[in-house]
């Protein structure tokens, strides 16, 4: 893993709605709770003790009822042990264990002080829509070459840290790719489709911060037109 801090300080300008007018309407869809290899590319809740498929997107960490500012940064750290991460974790932090590592996600200002661990990335600013409270969720995805997500939206920003492979994000205003060690983010309510390019299995951590009164995500009727390139 690179020791260089990856800092993403742009909001992915292609997400601005003035480029496309009003987005295609979203089709409300409840969060999936059943793990099934038949539908591996919709992020599903992992029930403790349940065996999950080899490939898919799995919601593995959550922090509810957060009182966040209108713009926050995602600080991602790794720790040598669960105990070490617990000692450094704030009340709003999220700890997950994937890819043989212990990951801690914290949210705050760009210069939020660190309390230990190895800082992997700082992603943001992530713009939040007004809400009484927000919920932050961490997902872990493992996708094969040419796999793709459903077309979907979120009521808040979505951000990624790519662990391995290359992923391509298609939106109404174009495409964007990220390789291992890189990050990307999009603004709320933007229709999108995520796919894997290249010959390597892609693994990533995903953050979605959404209105606590709304679902994790919703299916969208928007249809991608631009092609992803390897």
Question: Which sequence ranges carry the predicted segments?
Answer:
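N-terminal secretory signal peptides that target proteins for export/translocation
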Residues: 1-8
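Jelly-roll (double-stranded beta-helix
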Residues: 9-14, 19-161, 166-230
